């Protein structure tokens, strides 16, 4: 029985990982128990048929929260506790430590931990195993906090349930993105690229999925490029895959991603993708599609060239590229294969 604990407020890659891997492990005969703040995370877990409970975490080390997890872990005979951020470790992690339950710290970004006393003390006292989303993320964390190199530290790629092989092209073609609406995610460069392509007479539509702290700013960036009439902002959606199914071309405009879970979701849906050559993205990129990786600090000019090429390709040629990305997803992060890897690692721990 595995507890997945996540106290973060925003939806991020680790939450998607928890739900996907929890469901896959449940189908392999394990029990999955999800704990999160009131909101979409526990609700989505329940929709997937997982056991889920809303938790009000309070401050780090909150004795009431620790007591709650002590009761829960005893009640459900939890064998492994998987946490995300420090608050998870300093509540559920402490409860797991008292009960002798192995703890895993699931990390999704090189900046998740700082080299400071609180990090050292938590790592020393709780002794969690560490699990990163990519080799890039793992290496970055060890550079930031050298002591982590002394611990059991694995890197296992994220995973998805894969639909059928892509077989359709929309008319007009649809460009879609789904990363968080944050000023650091590079949406302005994507909108600039779309503007340049539109000026060349290319007809297309754009869908921007999700929300974030700078949603209004991103919408203003879209308006400033004259794209309001062809762009749809969906806001928060509970089923990202359904939205991705409406697209043909996916753009990940982020300047740097530890792996790019949004990109993996798009590849798993069989979309032709454009991203920056940075972070962990090259680890999962199809070897034959290097021309669709633009420079890390591109202002949108190279992105415009990549978009123009995909939007004007003959249908069969674009479909072939979509199939390349889908094939890489099948090869690299099919949920059943990743669940097997995680299961094997968990058995070694337990």
What spans do the regions from the language model cover?
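A conserved mid-protein helix/loop that constitutes part of the nucleotide-sugar donor-binding site
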Residues: 12-20, 173, 180-196, 202, ...
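Nucleotide-activated donor-binding/catalytic signature segment of Leloir-type glycosyltransferases, i.e.
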Residues: 219-235
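A short, active-site helix/loop in glycosyltransferases that binds the activated sugar's phosphate group
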Residues: 127-152
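A conserved, positively charged/aromatic
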Residues: 103-131, 146
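Conserved acidic donor-binding segment of nucleotide-sugar-dependent glycosyltransferases
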Residues: 287-301, 309-315
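Aromatic "clamp/platform" in nucleotide-sugar-dependent glycosyltransferases that forms part
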Residues: 236, 255
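Short His-centered aromatic/hydrophobic patch
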Residues: 83-89, 107
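Short hydrophobic beta-strand element within catalytic cores of glycosyltransferases
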Residues: 34, 272-275
């Amino acid at each position: 029985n595995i507890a997945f604990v996540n106290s973060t407020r925003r939806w991020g890659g680790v939450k998607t990982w928890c739900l996907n891997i929890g469901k896959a492990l449940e189908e392999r005969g394990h029990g999955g128990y999800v704990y999160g703040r009131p909101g979409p995370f526990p609700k989505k877990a329940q929709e997937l048929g997982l056991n889920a409970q809303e938790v009000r975490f309070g401050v780090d080390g909150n004795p009431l929260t620790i007591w709650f997890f002590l009761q829960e872990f005893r009640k459900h005979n939890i064998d492994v506790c998987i946490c995300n951020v420090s608050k998870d470790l300093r509540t559920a992690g402490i409860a797991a430590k008292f009960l002798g339950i192995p703890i895993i710290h699931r990390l999704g970004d090189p900046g998740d931990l700082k080299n400071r006393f609180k990090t050292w003390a938590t790592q020393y006292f709780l002794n969690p195993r560490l699990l990163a989303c990519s080799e890039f993320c793992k290496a970055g964390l060890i550079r930031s906090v050298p002591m982590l190199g002394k611990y059991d530290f694995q890197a296992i790629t994220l995973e998805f349930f894969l639909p059928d092989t892509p077989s359709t092209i929309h008319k007009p073609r649809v460009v879609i993105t789904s990363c968080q609406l944050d000023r650091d995610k590079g949406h302005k460069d994507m909108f600039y690229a779309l503007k340049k392509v539109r000026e060349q007479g290319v007809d297309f539509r754009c869908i921007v999925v999700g929300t974030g702290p700078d949603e209004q700013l991103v919408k203003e960036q879209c308006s400033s490029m004259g794209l309001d009439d062809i762009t749809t902002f969906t806001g928060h959606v509970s089923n990202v895959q359904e939205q991705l199914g409406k697209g043909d071309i996916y753009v990940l405009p982020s300047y740097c991603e530890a792996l790019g879970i949004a990109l993996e979701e798009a590849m798993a849906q069989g979309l032709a993708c454009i991203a920056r050559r940075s972070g962990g993205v090259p680890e999962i990129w199809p070897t034959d599609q290097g021309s669709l990786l633009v420079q890390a600090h591109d202002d949108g000019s190279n992105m415009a060239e990549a978009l123009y090429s995909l939007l004007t390709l003959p249908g069969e040629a674009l479909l072939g590229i979509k199939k390349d990305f889908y094939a890489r997803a099948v090869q690299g992060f099919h949920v059943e294969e990743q669940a097997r890897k995680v299961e094997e690692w968990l058995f070694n721990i337990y």
